[in-house]
């Protein structure tokens, strides 16, 4: 599994692994329960390699955020999203100290940590963007 094959679909919980292209969109597999479904071409689908986080300087790719989280947690999952916004912001602030606190909302941090935990739980250890 590579990060370029992991997708977020608007309106659907969790992350999905790209399996194949279908006549009407994509066949994806949920990382939460392993079920496959058809994601229509009209769905808002984003590859995780296309997402970035606001910082005080240049925006950084989500792959770099995940790499820093992985190094900080030494390969373990991050804090549970049930621990509350204060704990998640503290964790995120340690991992990405220069994130833009005005443009990165609590929900963004919660989603990033949740996605990171899903990927680590699924066995992903490298969060690299493939060079083209």
Enumerate the predicted regions with their spans.
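Eukaryotic low-complexity, mixed-charge intrinsically disordered interaction/regulatory segments enriched
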Residues: 71-76, 83-86, 94-98
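C-terminal charged interaction modules
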Residues: 87-132
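General N-terminal targeting signals
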Residues: 35, 43-45, 68-70, 83, ...
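The feature represents the first ordered module of a protein
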Residues: 1-80
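Conserved phosphate/pyrophosphate-binding and hydrolysis machinery centered on Walker-type P-loop NTPases
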Residues: 56-59, 78-85, 102-109
